[in-house]
């Protein structure tokens, strides 16, 4: 299934498969060939996910593994996405739980048109809730190197911080 999202396309190979985003969508520049996993099949199934691009407010996604990083466009800043609770992922050291609030006072731009939230005070010894400076990369990367998943943290910042781990490329 596919949906037109502004100037870009949103497509899903199959239920439980992968979502492939174009290099440019809604006027923003996104990493090409980045893979996002989902277990939501219908654009009307929006209860646990967040809206994606302008014009696709009913299209949601929910990460199912530690490989998943999120992108959000401007209309989605007040949306929340809730990762599956109690998932232990490698190379992360903790599970992710709770939800992220977009548009909150702790939002910071990732530098390519999307916004990311993190919990103030999160980031104790060796953990970061946002990837700025993590492994030497300022944000979710362009090109071959980026720090994978450092972008998930709950509002309360309890047991939901991520340890940044450098990757050599995007997941395909």
From Swiss-Prot:
Weak expression seen in the late matrix and entire cortex area of the hair follicle. Keywords: Keratin, Repeat. The keyword Repeat applies. Residues 46-101 are annotated as: 5 X 10 AA approximate repeats. InterPro entries: Keratin_matx (IPR007659), KRTAP_PMG (IPR007951). GO terms for molecular function: structural molecule activity. Disulfide bonds: none annotated. It holds the Pfam family PMG. It comes from the Eukaryota. Sequence repeats lie at residues 46-55, 56-65, 66-75, 76-85, 92-101. One of its GO terms (cellular component) is keratin filament. Belongs to the PMG family. In the hair cortex, hair keratin intermediate filaments are embedded in an interfilamentous matrix, consisting of hair keratin-associated proteins (KRTAP), which are essential for the formation of a rigid and resistant hair shaft through their extensive disulfide bond cross-linking with abundant cysteine residues of hair keratins. The matrix proteins include the high-sulfur and high-glycine-tyrosine keratins. Interacts with hair keratins. This is Keratin-associated protein 13-1. It comes from Homo sapiens (Human).
């Amino acid at each position: 299934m596919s949906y037109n999202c502004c100037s870009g396309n949103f497509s899903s190979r199959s239920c439980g498969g992968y979502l492939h985003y174009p290099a440019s969508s809604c006027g923003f520049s996104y990493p090409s060939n980045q893979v996002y996993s989902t277990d939501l099949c219908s654009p009307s199934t929006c209860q646990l996910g967040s809206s994606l691009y302008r014009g696709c407010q009913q299209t949601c996604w929910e990460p199912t593994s530690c490989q998943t990083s999120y992108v959000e466009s401007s209309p989605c800043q007040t949306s929340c996405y809730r990762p599956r609770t109690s998932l232990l992922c490698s190379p992360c050291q903790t599970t992710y739980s709770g939800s992220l609030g977009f548009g909150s006072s702790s939002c910071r731009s990732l530098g390519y048109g999307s916004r990311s939230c993190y919990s103030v005070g999160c980031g104790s010894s060796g953990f970061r809730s946002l990837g700025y400076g993590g492994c030497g990369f300022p944000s979710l990367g362009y090109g071959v190197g980026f720090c994978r998943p450092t972008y998930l943290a709950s509002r309360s910042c309890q047991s939901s911080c991520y340890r940044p781990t450098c990757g050599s490329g995007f997941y395909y």
